[in-house]
Amino acid sequence: MTTRKSAEAITYPIFTVRWLSIHALAVPTIFFLGSITAMQFIQR
């Protein structure tokens, strides 16, 4: 890593386009994986 003083002063916002795109894909994926695995244990 190079010693750059300018990079330390940058405050990154939390809600970025990358954050929205990751969570828009990840949150339904985790929800559907959890629901599918829960359905495997349902005895009919």
Curated annotation (Swiss-Prot):
One Pfam family of this chain: Cytochrom_B559
Q: Where does heme bind?
A: H23
* Cofactor requirements of the protein: heme b
Molecular function per GO: electron transfer activity; heme binding; iron ion binding
Known InterPro entries for this protein?
A: PSII_cyt_b559_bsu (IPR006241), PSII_cyt_b559_CS (IPR006216), PSII_cyt_b559_N (IPR013081)
List the SUPFAM superfamilies hit by this protein, alphabetically.
Cytochrome b559 subunits
| Keyword set, alphabetical order | Chloroplast, Electron transport, Heme, Iron, Membrane, Metal-binding, Photosynthesis, Photosystem II, Plastid, Thylakoid, Transmembrane, Transmembrane helix, Transport
Which GO biological process annotations does it have?
photosynthetic electron transport chain
Cofactor stoichiometry and binding remark? With its partner (PsbE) binds heme. PSII binds additional chlorophylls, carotenoids and specific lipids.
What residue ranges are annotated as transmembrane?
A: 19-35
Membrane topology value: Single-pass membrane protein
The compartments listed are: Plastid, Chloroplast thylakoid membrane
Q: Which domain of life is it from?
A: Eukaryota
How is the quaternary structure described? Heterodimer of an alpha subunit and a beta subunit. PSII is composed of 1 copy each of membrane proteins PsbA, PsbB, PsbC, PsbD, PsbE, PsbF, PsbH, PsbI, PsbJ, PsbK, PsbL, PsbM, PsbT, PsbX, PsbY, PsbZ, Psb30/Ycf12, at least 3 peripheral proteins of the oxygen-evolving complex and a large number of cofactors. It forms dimeric complexes.
Family per record: Belongs to the PsbE/PsbF family.
Protein's UniProt name: Cytochrome b559 subunit beta
